[in-house]
Amino acid sequence: MRPNFDVSGDPRPRNGEGSRSEISAPSITPVLVAELLAEGERMPVYVHVIDHPDARVLVDTGLTELHPAVADMDPRLVPLSRQAGFDVGGIDVVINTHLHFDHCGGNHLFAGRPTYVQRRELDDARSLNDYTIRDWVDAPGVQYVPVDGELEVLPGVRLVPTPGHTPGSQVVVVETGGRPVVIAGDTAVFFGELDEPRTEGQRLVRALDPELVWLSHEHQPWRPQTDQHV
């Protein structure tokens, strides 16, 4: 991992915030990076920033340019590199929940940073036709860290495989002092898929007993209801 220290060895403040030593527990911030046309409606695309005492982590990277392969989805882009409040250089670690185009299209912005992805997902993205935009997967300088199964990336931040949306999908489980918070990518695209889980990945997310679950294509997090049963 590329530590974020200044020349004195002290952690650098981020965007007017205090130093990392002042952050008692990880916090999660959703960032809107695009809208896509899906089934006649505009669908948001979010990435998520984890501010951890040891590193700033970005979960998924959105997309930064148009491509003929997805022109029918009429992308409206708000790339991270053009957002005034977002410090591209301040990201230490990248995690891809999976490698569909709207989750890896900004990976090139973080060349040289460790980018964690399940090995199965990376293999599929590189070998299967019509899976993703391969030029975006292997953009110059992207440094993947292939993962096999569960992995603790930082204390209290771990990766959990959740096959379903793709065989190599994973979620990020963040311990915040109570029940965990999950950043789930497209393991569930809509709330209803967690209300009534059908895929192995969706059932695994519910089994984590999360306080809330951030999804890539919903404006608000999903929260379990007391009368729901897996």
Show where each model-derived region lies.
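Zn-dependent metallo-beta-lactamase
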Residues: 1-58, 63-67, 201-212, 221-230
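Metallo-beta-lactamase
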Residues: 15-18, 64, 75-102, 117-161, 167-230
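Short, structured coil segments at secondary-structure junctions
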Residues: 24, 110-111, 140, 209
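Pre-active-site segment of Zn-dependent metallo-hydrolases
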Residues: 38-40, 55-93
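Metal-dependent catalytic neighborhoods of phosphoester/phosphodiester hydrolases
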Residues: 105-111, 224-228
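Short hydrophobic/aromatic-enriched beta-strand-loop microsegments
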Residues: 114-119, 182-185
